[in-house]
């Protein structure tokens, strides 16, 4: 919404009159086209950029799509970079994509809903190198940081854009001048729950080191799971290092069938995902309270309950 209003300052009052286009990875979250529909941009104006073999958006393909749209009379305005794709947990190259956004004067957003918590880890924050170059960044503390639902944060370097896009005068509200703490002026909601308290209490409770340890533990557990898969010939690994999504298949059993069996036997609950034409079991090590023993027990339970 901020990106739209920055690109077309009249659209907030007069409505959208330009053919505006959005760019995102083909592996990004479904909320991108959903929000394009809500805003009146239209799902058909979302351009899905192909990913490489690691699931990362390809900058060269992005620039080509932008250039082609400009030539066709469209108005590109927003590029979404994903920090932790839903299936593979891939991180798009922020720095490379920022250069393209700067060249074409586009708003760069980093969607860190899933794995944006890596900003708290000295060991893994390189995965979002260049995040300070973005115009906005969002992450869900109820994912990697484990706060209660819902606790979502958006950060932008354009404070004035928040006010221009979300403020709306009402005589019976906002009667104090200069109230920077009144989020009704800078967000869609007016009345709202104090969701920020969830992150604040966690931070006060465990501190920077505690949050960093939580994030690092999730990657450690993923390493444990990947090592197990790699060392056992009945498994085939489909994911990669530096991801908390561990994707694999077992004994060539269709992933959907295997996950359904485990669920129906009340053995364990794990989901499945798909990248390109391959479907696989998708183990997410996002619970920092788990241990190495819990991960190894998961595989034992899976193996014992995999047959019909």
Task: Describe these PLM feature segments.
Residues 156, 248-252, 285-287:
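Short beta-strand-to-loop capping motifs
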Residues 235-262:
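Conserved PLP-binding catalytic core of the aspartate aminotransferase-like
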């Amino acid at each position: 919404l901020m990106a739209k209003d920055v690109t077309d300052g009249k659209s907030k009052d007069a409505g959208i009159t330009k053919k505006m286009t959005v760019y995102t990875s083909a592996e990004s979250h479904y909320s991108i086209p959903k929000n394009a529909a809500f805003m009146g941009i239209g799902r058909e104006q979302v351009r899905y950029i192909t990913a490489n073999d690691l699931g990362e958006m390809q900058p060269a393909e992005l620039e080509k799509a932008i250039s082609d749209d400009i030539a066709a009379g469209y108005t590109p305005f927003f590029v979404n970079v994903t920090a932790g794709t839903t299936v593979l947990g891939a991180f798009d190259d922020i720095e490379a994509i920022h250069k393209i956004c700067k060249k074409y004067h586009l708003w760069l957003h980093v969607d860190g809903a899933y794995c944006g918590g890596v900003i708290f880890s000295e060991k893994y924050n390189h995965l979002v190198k260049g995040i300070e170059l973005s115009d906005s960044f969002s992450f869900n503390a109820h994912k990697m940081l484990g706060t209660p639902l819902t606790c979502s944060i958006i950060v932008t370097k354009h404070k004035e854009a928040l006010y221009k896009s979300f403020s709306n005068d009402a005589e019976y509200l906002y009667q104090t001048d200069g109230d920077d703490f009144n989020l009704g002026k800078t967000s869609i909601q007016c009345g709202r729950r104090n969701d920020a308290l969830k992150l604040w209490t966690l931070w006060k409770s465990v501190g920077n080191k505690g949050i960093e340890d939580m994030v690092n533990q999730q990657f450690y557990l993923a390493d444990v799971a990947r090592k197990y898969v790699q060392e056992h010939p009945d498994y085939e690994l489909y994911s990669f290092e530096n991801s908390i999504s561990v994707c694999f298949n077992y004994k060539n059993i269709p992933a959907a069938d295997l996950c359904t069996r485990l669920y129906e036997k009340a053995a364990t609950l794990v989901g499945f995902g798909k990248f390109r034409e391959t479907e696989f079991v998708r183990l997410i090590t996002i619970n920092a309270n788990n241990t190495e023993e819990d991960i190894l027990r998961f595989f034992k339970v899976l193996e014992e309950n995999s047959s019909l």
